[in-house]
Amino acid sequence: MITLAPSLDTPKTDQNQVSDPQTSHVFKSKLPDIPISNHLPLHSYCFQNLSQFAHRPCLIVGPASKTFTYADTHLISSKIAAGLSNLGILKGDVVMILLQNSADFVFSFLAISMIGAVATTANPFYTAPEIFKQFTVSKAKLIITQAMYVDKLRNHDGAKLGEDFKVVTVDDPPENCLHFSVLSEANESDVPEVEIHPDDAVAMPFSSGTTGLPKGVILTHKSLTTSVAQQVDGENPNLYLTTEDVLLCVLPLFHIFSLNSVLLCALRAGSAVLLMQKFEIGTLLELIQRHRVSVAMVVPPLVLALAKNPMVADFDLSSIRLVLSGAAPLGKELEEALRNRMPQAVLGQGYGMTEAGPVLSMCLGFAKQPFQTKSGSCGTVVRNAELKVVDPETGRSLGYNQPGEICIRGQQIMKGYLNDEAATASTIDSEGWLHTGDVGYVDDDDEIFIVDRVKELIKYKGFQVPPAELEGLLVSHPSIADAAVVPQKDVAAGEVPVAFVVRSNGFDLTEEAVKEFIAKQVVFYKRLHKVYFVHAIPKSPSGKILRKDLRAKLETAATQTP
């Protein structure tokens, strides 16, 4: 069973309520609040309208195009739920899903919800230490994965596969592992009757938040049902999806943006989801053309490929009506380049944070009755939520066109960080406001623009790279006395991690040696792209790294490069 850090109840506010003078500038959606069925467990909410589209396609899997209907998806998920129960997984237990995009990922996630357990999703490309950090902190009882990743799971830190924890593989199982059929061939009538409360945890992605190392983010059934409803429910949904739509799912489902805004939103709306395990431009374009993909959820590097790759001209992408870019800011030039490539599509951005469930705002150009929107905006705050912008120094709320830290309040935000009261309290204040660590402003038309970041996090192609994690590894090297990691802007990736390193006295150390030392211990997107050797790391009197000074050094160096 998992133990949660004490949560802070989110205050309920009237639609037009004005708070005290200290928090008087509160922004709401242009769309009216709606009733939300967030009393339902997540799986029940997603399948609430199943009878209306039971025989329509739900999942279309990759180049082979194997298709599962909604009825298939519900049945197989129910069988796996029974199978998990047969293996001893109880309400509140944690199951790790260590898979690339696949139908088995979807079935497993829904099955975990059905028995009141908790899914912690992890990147299968993580190194063994990265996987076991999440596995250990989450106290997972079972891992669902592929055989190719099992070697990473053997005898790490004394935990014995098959004895201390179970591993189920979706393909031929290696020694001491179970085959997925022990789950998928169970009798669906054996799913136990479990009382699930809206505040029970259902998902535990890991996020660094505004600072520090990755932490378990407790998302409840209420969190995720509310977030999905804010996007796709109501007479005029913010994200208008129909049973005729086919959504592109090339972004990894272990990332909350893809899990929520692609998979869960599609399930609720009865749309089909085209699953791709990895991004390969030729395959992507062929599948979009073959399956008449109508909604593409993307990140800026994918936008770059669609806007600039010459292969795009050889395919018919006229079926695409919506392109939603998220996970990292999209530059105006890139946005304009894609508009020129796909003039028929509505292009807009969403803005989110894992801890916020994750969607804070979304382009209203995606609504059933769309609004005019501005280039560069990441939309307006989602309905049934409140947003404010505060001065990071004073905490005073700010009005229109005044940049400050963005804060969000609503029933979609996380319950808290797993076993970390201090981090929870520093992120969600006593009034229920979640502080994002992002700097932005709201313009006169209620559109949100992100301009900077208070938090330390680096975003590489939408993936989180926590500087503290890399700094901890760097200073563990005997030849390194001190180190700091900061982001450097990059056209293709958005940001890349670079390190400033202080050598220990008498030690000789090369840039390549430092890069190799880190590369052996982390997933590919956390690898260092540049190492600068310095005499000292700039720090405040309290010992905090002055990251702004280091970022300024990078910018100066960039302007001086011929």
Swiss-Prot record:
In terms of InterPro entries, this protein maps to: AMP-bd_C (IPR025110), AMP-bd_C_sf (IPR045851), AMP-binding_CS (IPR020845), AMP-dep_synth/lig_dom (IPR000873), ANL_N_sf (IPR042099)
The record's keywords, sorted A to Z, are:
ATP-binding, Ligase, Magnesium, Nucleotide-binding, Phenylpropanoid metabolism
Which EC class heads this enzyme's classification? Answer: ligase
Q: What Gene Ontology terms describe what this protein does at the molecular function level?
A: 4-coumarate-CoA ligase activity; ATP binding
Q: Where does CoA bind?
A: K278, K461, G462
Region: Disordered; residue ranges are 1-22
The reaction(s) catalysed by this protein are: (E)-4-coumarate + ATP + CoA = (E)-4-coumaroyl-CoA + AMP + diphosphate; (E)-4-coumarate + ATP + H(+) = (E)-4-coumaroyl-AMP + diphosphate; (E)-4-coumaroyl-AMP + CoA = (E)-4-coumaroyl-CoA + AMP + H(+)
Q: Which Gene3D superfamilies match?
A: 3.30.300.30, N-terminal domain of ligase-like
Write out the ranges of the annotated region (SBD2): 350-417
Offer one Pfam family short name for this entry: AMP-binding
Q: Where is region (SBD1) located?
A: 280-349
The protein's annotated pathway: Phytoalexin biosynthesis; 3,4',5-trihydroxystilbene biosynthesis; 3,4',5-trihydroxystilbene from trans-4-coumarate: step 1/2
- For binding ATP, which residues are annotated in this chain's numbering? S207, S208, G209, T210, T211, K215, Q349, G350, T354, D438, R453, K544
Q: Which GO terms describe its biological process?
A: phenylpropanoid metabolic process
Instruction: State its Enzyme Commission number(s).
Output: 6.2.1.12
List the SUPFAM superfamilies: Acetyl-CoA synthetase-like
Q: Which cofactor does it need?
A: Mg(2+)
Q: What is the recorded function of this protein according to its Swiss-Prot or TrEMBL entry?
A: Carboxylate--CoA ligase that may use 4-coumarate as substrate. Follows a two-step reaction mechanism, wherein the carboxylate substrate first undergoes adenylation by ATP, followed by a thioesterification in the presence of CoA to yield the final CoA thioester.
**Comment block on domains:** Both substrate-binding domains (SBD1 and SBD2) are involved in the substrate recognition, and are sufficient to confer the substrate specificity.
Q: Which family does it belong to?
A: Belongs to the ATP-dependent AMP-binding enzyme family.
Q: What is this protein called?
A: 4-coumarate--CoA ligase 2
Which species?
A: Glycine max
